[in-house]
């Protein structure tokens, strides 16, 4: 029996009306403009565009050096002690329940003990909030600061998630420069010039992603004094504090919390090479209690109350992970990164259109300046990376993704052989696109480019 033969549309569902329903003007809902604006400044959007230019050529396999995740390479695997800490909790059954929004107390105590090793003004467990990775810490703190007309000062270049979340939270973004000629120090006069009565905070990243520098005690003190003068807090991202392979010691911004309130963001993803475990923290460095009296502590707690809490299994393992001596793990990782920096800088000497004036001392990236006048048919850093992906199946990150036009970021947190292959392809690409005119070579030899 054909059931459709007796089917009759109700009188109010005419054919014309059915067609009209495809007209979106009759519907009252729309996708979020905030999400569209925020995602437009994320690094992923650019990386996806670059991947779209790549091919499946098995003779020249894809080399993804645009984003950093050393954990995918066996040589960077975390230590067995760290893994066993989680395994022991898993087998005990003690990590199977929900936890408080701020994190379980043993985890908060472990983080407090860990950060206090380098602090004069100690933090208490109640000053610590456990988050789903450092990224959720960024989101919670920025959302807690958001109010009508408020603006926040972000570094340029920077980790793009700060701008994306500020935009999503309705904060106006103002960018201050990091100065390459001064080893990427913060332009403090520039900060004073752009701040106004609606400025609520400034963000610093130390050790710095993507520049790879480590700020000195004196410079950080000046940062704190500038923040105090402006009446703003300092948000400091210190997730790379265990990824330092240069000579400069790490100084936590919390050392200057007696000058201005400091909110420290951290996590185990970079130091312990376990980004997939998604454990980070917010630590409040504020001996004078300003964050509490201004409502920031309450706002952070309230924002955590409406977000998912971090996995209890890894939280319960934090006392073991942070309490153990991890010197061997850190030393091995940092030694490999330092060797990779030397490798890249040595090979870049053969590529005149890419220059690294300052070797990174930390993190898993290397920034190199693109000398466009030496190249033909290359418009800018984005064009360079798009054509490189298409011709060489090599993905590097254009500086524009970080707020630094005509620079290139190379990920060094990979296996050395991959870097060797990538640099060989990069050299070949640059040679093909190098201008053959005598004037360009003359300018290069005279140091004018």
Curated annotation (Swiss-Prot):
InterPro entries: Aminotransferase_I/II_large, PyrdxlP-dep_Trfase, PyrdxlP-dep_Trfase_major, PyrdxlP-dep_Trfase_small, TyrNic_aminoTrfase. This is Probable aminotransferase TAT1. It comes from Arabidopsis thaliana. Belongs to the class-I pyridoxal-phosphate-dependent aminotransferase family. Residues 1-12 have a biased composition (Polar residues). The keyword Transferase applies. GO terms for molecular function: pyridoxal phosphate binding; transaminase activity. GO terms for biological process: amino acid metabolic process; biosynthetic process. Residues 1-20 are annotated as: Disordered. Keywords: Aminotransferase, Pyridoxal phosphate, Transferase. It comes from the Eukaryota.
